[in-house]
Amino acid sequence: MLKLLKTAFKHRNATVAYPAKPMQVDPNFRGKPEYNPEQCIACGACTAACPANALTMETDAREGTRTWALHLGRCIFCARCEEVCPTAAIKLSQEFEMAVWNKSDLFQTAEFKVCSCVECGAPYAAQKEINYAMALLVQAGNLTEEQAEERRPQFETCPNCKRKNNITHSARITLGRHLTQEAAQ
């Protein structure tokens, strides 16, 4: 008995005071994702990278909104979302306690206004994403604020309409070249 007490005093506590004191985790621990909708541009990079499909993004054309959703019950804490996010809107925290009374508490959502194409009216991207792209071009020095605003209709044109416009423009150039070559002969 004395031997057991001697060993117990020598090695101290074998357990931690976890519920009473917060438990220290490794600095590289990947816990609950923390999402900041103010920083998010709704680009969808995180939803494409998520292997567990814990992140989803749905566009409602009638409402003109894009809804981002995180289902914590599906998250495998791989940090792919954090790696691909261009604005650092989602980060994995040190928090590991995720027990909830209500299953709906495992869901996080955010809504974003969707930009509709200036030519066909189809929704295609979040307005915040377009504004972010324009701001990046201004910040890089490729455009001034005024030039960016002048080109806003180009930014707010969907890829399909841009493709159609380029094909039409390309056909005119080809026709012009053909006529020029015939006139020269």
Regions found by a protein language model. Give the residues of each.
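Non-ligating segments of multi-cofactor redox enzymes
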Residues: M1-A61, T65, H71-R74, R80-Q185
